[in-house]
Amino acid sequence: MNLHEYQAKEILARYGVPVPPGKVAYTPEEAKRIAEEFGKRVVIKAQVHVGGRGKAGGVKLADTPQEAYEKAQAILGMNIKGLTVKKVLVAEAVDIAKEYYAGLILDRAKKRVVLMLSKEGGVDIEEVAAERPEAIHKFWIDPHKGFRPFEAREMVKRAGLEGNLNKLAQVLVALYRAYEGVDASIAEINPLVVTTDGGIVAADAKIVLDDNALFRHPDLAELREVEAEHPLEVEASNYGFAYVKLDGNIGIIGNGAGLVMYTLDLVNRVGGKPANFLDIGGGAKADVVYNALKVVLKDPDVKGVFINIFGGITRADEVAKGVIRALEEGLLTKPVVMRVAGTAEEEAKKLLEGKPVYMYPTSIEAAKAIVAMVGGAA
């Protein structure tokens, strides 16, 4: 379940992450009143469940309350990637000295939470992963031991982040506590800002909650706004898997958030552009794979699909059966490449032998193949 930026910031603040003061406005008049209340420069930010708001014109600075009114008026009602902006966050602008990226996801293969840090914050992290993968530093956290301040300080040093070491470490520990506390599947701060006076603040934030854990958080479940979500994200949620719509033309299906994120990075690195994040989870049966393909192929932007599976509790032959069902029902009208490894790998290959699905032994070969088939980035 996706949260709006202001909701993500409220959660982070609850766990001790510093965030700029901000309030939600539904009208230009409300935006003006909030700006008057703050009495300083503000940023007006569209609240929709998609990325790329800044590029679409959904983030604007305002020096005066009247400007806040005008900028909010321009943003409210705007269509960003198929979603209408119905509210904006009016937040105090921060004086930026440095911008970093910090994000947490679950790596199912390693049974660890992975912390990603980069000195290149404030930009699309997927672009950084594609163009400069060495700029993203990854650290695995044992959830049984937790994440301790001395480990956070060591990670900050290894990633080369500059600023108050202790403050940065405290923010990372608080981010992890928030991630764990609300059962998130993704928690990101981008940018994590070092201000000109040496402060640390989360200028933007993203949290995706694990739908399977919402029963433990009825207060958070009530925040769901179905009308604010992409229709495909709603459908995927109904099927029980994590799906996030992205900007590209290559559908991505994998098992485990870590593997899916790696696959997104890989496709970007070889010149492609992912159309989505879709994690079928562990132990997925054929019907789950079939439903995942249904969702991905409903996206008109998708020109081809890359299925990347590492079989542990997920059996590769079950994945193959789901693909075969989609073939038999005529769903696979776009090229599909697959890389499968692990449990029942050979059985999967035998099942798919002679089928119009392209099998590759490694992820990099599969990524290069699908990018070539769809003609590169969208």
UniProtKB/Swiss-Prot annotation:
Pathway: Carbohydrate metabolism; tricarboxylic acid cycle; succinate from succinyl-CoA (ligase route): step 1/1. Optimum pH is 8.0-8.4. GO terms for biological process: succinyl-CoA metabolic process; tricarboxylic acid cycle. It comes from the Bacteria. One of its GO terms (cellular component) is cytosol. GTP binds at residues 45, 52-54, 94, 99. It is an enzyme of class 6 (ligase). Its EC number is 6.2.1.4. Binds 1 Mg(2+) ion per subunit. Keywords: GTP-binding, Ligase, Magnesium, Metal-binding, Nucleotide-binding, Tricarboxylic acid cycle. Belongs to the succinate/malate CoA ligase beta subunit family. Heterotetramer of two alpha and two beta subunits. This is Succinate--CoA ligase [GDP-forming] subunit beta. The lineage of its organism: Bacteria, Thermotogati, Deinococcota, Deinococci, Thermales. The gene is sucC.
